[in-house]
Amino acid sequence: FRGQNILGYRPYADDVVDYFVQKSISNGIDIIRIFDCLNDLRNLQEAVNATNKFKAQEGRGEAQVALAYTLGDAYSLEYWTGMAKKIEEMGADSICIKDMAGLLVPYKAAELIKAMKEVTKLPIQLHTHYTSGVASMTYLKAVEAGVDVIDTAMSPFAMGTSQPATEV
């Protein structure tokens, strides 16, 4: 969900975020994937804290911080590895590289995964879309580089703007 914005497009109070996370975990959602479209970790801290609080109470729940992958001069390996370190420090259980536009290409994925694995012990999950037609190869290179989890979709729902097919 969208951190302080939960599932909407405006910020909510900390107690509302806390209650949303509590209800999510108590109703069976184990992985709380939290992101901010601008990768502003301040907007994610309350959700991470809430997940960790209810994980301690319920015995389950994982705070997964998702980084919105994008291109540009500002988004160097140093940027991504710095974010990985901060995510680990803030108490997250795992990291998801969320490539919602399908911009991540195979060899860049391998480079990114290797670099992030060098700076964090957290599991890394990769989520990409087939929009540019290279997602399957991106996943292959990410797996070779040591990514822990990849997101896929069943073939009737896969490809196009979705994820690569699970069966392929």
Residue ranges of predicted features:
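Catalytic cores and adjacent flexible loops of soluble metabolic enzymes
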Residues: 1-168
